[in-house]
A protein has these predicted regions:
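Short loop-beta-helix segment that forms the pyridoxal 5′-phosphate
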Residues: 107-111, 128-148
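Conserved PLP-enzyme active-site core in the AAT-like
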Residues: 144-265
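TRNA-binding/sensing appendages of the translation machinery
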Residues: 27-41, 259-260
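Gly-rich Lys/Arg/Thr-decorated short loops/hinges at beta-loop-alpha junctions or inter-strand turns
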Residues: 97-109, 127-132, 163-166, 194, ...
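Positively charged, low-complexity/disordered segments
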Residues: 266-270
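N-terminal entrance/gating region of PLP-dependent enzymes' catalytic architecture
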Residues: 36-121, 127
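Charged, compositionally biased N-terminal leader segments and the immediate start
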Residues: 1-13, 17, 21
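Structural signal for hydrophobic packing residues in well-ordered secondary-structure cores
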Residues: 41, 63-71, 123, 127-134, ...
């Protein structure tokens, strides 16, 4: 294969190709094409007033100056939103290391090799922290993950549960409100009922096919759900947990007390 042929496929069309394409659609130039397709009232008649280009160092300094205008305050929102720090080793070796998004390979041109490795590292870390055998490559947020867990558990109902029409999910009352809201939005169209209550008063029944717990809960309390999980499993009821992933570096991971599904929250770094 000639090098110029390979290059032309990646560099794009040349002047001759452009001329052929313009003739095909009935115009003589790109300017005429723009005149006929872009309304005159939104076209800029004078050249863009762009500043002179910056080097990478100059641009980084400029962005840092702009960011310095922001005022960062301590947040007391809670409910999953906490102040965090970014260790220098993470910032340098992950966020500021271009190898994670520039290492392309000939056979995987649409995804960088660095991103694939980062996703594998992420999944490995999630499995280690949660003590779960599998992990996906994350969703939008904890609330979305919890809603997906409910949908998954609904689809995985046993034949007996499907025959009995089991459509109730027990949700502990100390779940984060935003998580409950998204779960409700996703559950209603599927005919799933979310029943909120105290987990210590939960009693399994034929209509309940799954449970969702918060760990730690909205009050900041760290509960031991081992006995609850055993009771649920005895009734063929699956258990999903919405947990703070960072807390699992110290707390007993859900996988060790029998959770079936796990949705986690990764806090933003400041």
């Amino acid at each position: 294969m000639k090098t110029d042929l390979l290059a032309s496929r990646h560099i794009g069309i040349n002047e001759q190709d452009t001329t052929v394409m313009l003739r095909k659609i009935g115009v003589d130039s790109l300017d005429e094409l723009i005149e006929k397709t872009i309304p005159a009232n939104i076209r800029l008649k004078e050249p863009l007033a762009l500043n002179a280009p910056l080097t990478e160092y100059e641009f980084g300094k400029h962005i840092a100056e702009l960011a310095g205008k922001n005022k960062l305050y301590t947040t007391y929102i809670g409910m999953g939103w906490y102040n965090t720090i970014t260790p220098a080793v993470i910032q340098r070796n992950v966020f500021e290391n271009p190898v994670w998004y520039t290492s392309y390979t000939p056979y995987q041109t649409e995804v960088s090799q660095g991103r694939l490795e980062a996703l594998m590292n992420f999944q490995t870390a999630i499995c280690d922290l949660t003590a779960m055998p599998l992990a996906n490559c994350s969703l939008l947020d904890e609330a979305t993950a919890a809603a997906e867990a409910v949908s998954m558990m609904y689809a995985l109902r046993s034949r007996a549960q499907q025959k009995a029409g089991a459509n109730v999910v027990f949700v502990d009352e100390n779940i984060f409100p935003q998580t409950l809201a998204v779960m409700t939005t996703r559950a209603v169209p599927q005919g799933i009922e979310l029943r909120v209550g105290k987990y210590k008063e939960f009693e399994p029944s034929q209509e309940v096919f799954a449970c969702v717990l918060q760990y730690p809960n909205s009050n900041g309390s760290v509960e031991d759900y081992t006995e609850f999980t055993e009771k649920a499993h005895a009734a063929d009821c699956k258990v999903a947990v919405a947990a703070d992933i960072l807390s699992l570096a110290l707390l007993t991971p859900p996988g060790e007390w029998g959770a079936d599904r796990k949705s986690t929250r990764l806090n933003s770094s400041h």
